[in-house]
């Protein structure tokens, strides 16, 4: 399974490590850790992206804060049960990590490809600044009967187009 490429869920992000590795859980003797990376947008804003990393990919006892890395893997979700409600937690599940000297300039450093099924009717709306957006909830299937539920936003003419998607439609 570790060699298998999942084609319906692929993500690559480049950013600066912002935290130490924090233990998350263990599966079949393999420890998994969370780390945050700061990823730049085209607008020069940044997002703090949580990344789940196997202890077999990198030395999780080292402090890599300030280091630039490229992470390739999948976008995953799970429900965290908090008191009276569930909270959808999103993260990148790292399959490969590469340490790079510096963040490259250019628009093509971060990308994501998701293929799945619409869970809810899209919500089309205009922001207070007049921008058209559509909120989507996409179910992306994984092996062994699991799925990741990924909220997505479409902008502009893509928002108008996506507003016509039906529940259960393959997108």
Regions found by a protein language model. Give the residues of each.
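OB-fold and OB-like single-stranded nucleic-acid-recognition modules
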Residues: 1-171
């Amino acid at each position: 399974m570790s060699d298998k490429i999942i084609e319906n869920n692929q993500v690559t992000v480049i950013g600066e490590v912002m935290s130490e590795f924090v233990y998350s859980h263990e599966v079949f003797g393999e420890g998994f850790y969370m780390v945050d990376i700061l990823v730049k947008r085209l607008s020069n804003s940044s997002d703090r992206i949580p990344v789940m990393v196997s202890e077999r990919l990198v030395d999780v006892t080292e402090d890599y804060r300030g280091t630039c890395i490229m992470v390739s893997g999948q976008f995953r979700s799970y429900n965290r049960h908090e008191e009276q409600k569930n909270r959808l937690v999103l993260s990148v599940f790292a399959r490969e990590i590469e340490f790079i000297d510096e963040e490259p300039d250019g628009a093509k450093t971060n990308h994501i490809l998701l293929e799945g099924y619409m869970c809810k009717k899209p919500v089309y709306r205009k922001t207070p600044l007049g921008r058209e957006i559509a909120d989507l909830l996409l179910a992306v299937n994984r092996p062994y009967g699991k799925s990741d539920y990924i909220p997505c936003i479409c902008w502009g003419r893509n928002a108008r187009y996506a507003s016509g998607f039906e529940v259960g439609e393959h997108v």
